[in-house]
Amino acid sequence: MPVLTRSAELFEKAKKFIPGGVNSPVRAFKSVGGTPIYMAKGQGAYMTDVDGNTYLDYVGSWGPFILGSMHPRLTAAIEYTLRNIGTSFGTPIEIEIEIAELLCQIVPSLEMVRMVNSGTEATMSAVRLARGYTGKDKIIKFEGCYHGHGDSFLIKAGSGVLTLGDPDSPGVTKGTANDTLNATYNDIESVKAIVNENKGQVAAIIIEPVAGNTGVIPAKKEFLVALRELCDAEGIVLIFDEVMCGFRVALGGAQELYGVTPDLTTMGKIIGGGLPVGAFGGKRKIMENIAPLGSVYQAGTLSGNPLALTAGLETLKILMEENPYPELERKAAFLEAGFKDNMNKLGLNYTQNRVGSMACLFFTENEVYDYNSAITADTAKYGKYFHSMLDQGIYLAPSQFEAMFTSFVHTDEDLEKTVKANYNALVAATK
């Protein structure tokens, strides 16, 4: 068990000045218990905390570190920009054009793209654009899909409160809730029913084609195809939120993997290389409605800043040159098979979901294909599992309902260590 003396001291101090002691809720370890760990350094597939403990990292800054931490080419590019170009100008810069052109080459749906500072900004902007383009107010999202902390997304407007709207967070107005409708993931009939009940009022359907904040739940291809057909028939803008799965499950994202092209796509995480960035883009006829070309307003002081775009551009170049995806698939499949073998030895039958290098071990024997099936997982057992893995030097997400990310720099030795630790942690979780 790692000694966390300094982490505990820092957390107590942080709680005096930062709400809950953290700047993002999941970091507080509330769902697994224990002391949040303060990191001091990252290198490759490893992190070292302020008490000197080292961990094999499967969080990867919640997705961006597909190439690991402190990739030498990436750090060199950022250092060059910092020393020779600058951090921000508030003017157009050439690298904006370079990364926009490259993104449009890589991602099937992109004809034009706008850079922002986070995934939340990207999804908020995409929904505003869809509303402005269509002249309609309502959007459909899916239970269990996370699109950032914009008001429109913090809604549970399905089931018995479908017509009234029920905000999930105080501070979200009833008016906003009324315009956000929740459908069931992987259930096209639930979507059709909502569209029919709100005929001519739905501006957009937004979906994570691989849901990554309810564990990992892949969309069924036939479901995405049916969404595409429904949106075409009803004049609805289809938005793929690929902030998490974009550039990870395939270079061109889930839309390349599934062969289904949305009208708009939101991106983030990997295209920032660990720095704050987001982007949204899609069909030219829609994107041309953004100011200054059109009347839909979107802006940002630091949007397109040189440091973030340098990190993103260099990351994309490395991914294109080195094509890590076959190796990522091999590594993630090795872990999946190893975990399954461990469960077989222990007489367990928990569910594993995986798409490429995104995976989740659910502590349930039920198939997990939507929000309701995901929440059958035993979170108490996951908490025991998490702490056992942590004690063995493996850092996983401190929540049952987050993804495990394999990176290009995880070695075979790292993977074998992880499989061995998994066996011990399964034993600890099921005592």
Swiss-Prot record:
GO terms for molecular function: glutamate-1-semialdehyde 2,1-aminomutase activity; pyridoxal phosphate binding; transaminase activity. GO terms for cellular component: cytoplasm. Homodimer. InterPro entries: 4pyrrol_synth_GluAld_NH2Trfase (IPR004639), Aminotrans_3 (IPR005814), Aminotrans_3_PPA_site (IPR049704), PyrdxlP-dep_Trfase (IPR015424), PyrdxlP-dep_Trfase_major (IPR015421), PyrdxlP-dep_Trfase_small (IPR015422). It is found in: Cytoplasm. Its EC number is 5.4.3.8. Belongs to the class-III pyridoxal-phosphate-dependent aminotransferase family. HemL subfamily. It comes from the Bacteria. This is Glutamate-1-semialdehyde 2,1-aminomutase. It catalyses: (S)-4-amino-5-oxopentanoate = 5-aminolevulinate. Its cofactor is pyridoxal 5'-phosphate. It is an enzyme of class 5 (isomerase). Keywords: Chlorophyll biosynthesis, Cytoplasm, Isomerase, Porphyrin biosynthesis, Pyridoxal phosphate. It comes from Chlorobaculum parvum (strain DSM 263 / NCIMB 8327) (Chlorobium vibrioforme subsp. thiosulfatophilum). Pathway: Porphyrin-containing compound metabolism; protoporphyrin-IX biosynthesis; 5-aminolevulinate from L-glutamyl-tRNA(Glu): step 2/2; Porphyrin-containing compound metabolism; chlorophyll biosynthesis. The modification N6-(pyridoxal phosphate)lysine is found at K269. The gene is hemL. It holds the Pfam family Aminotran_3.
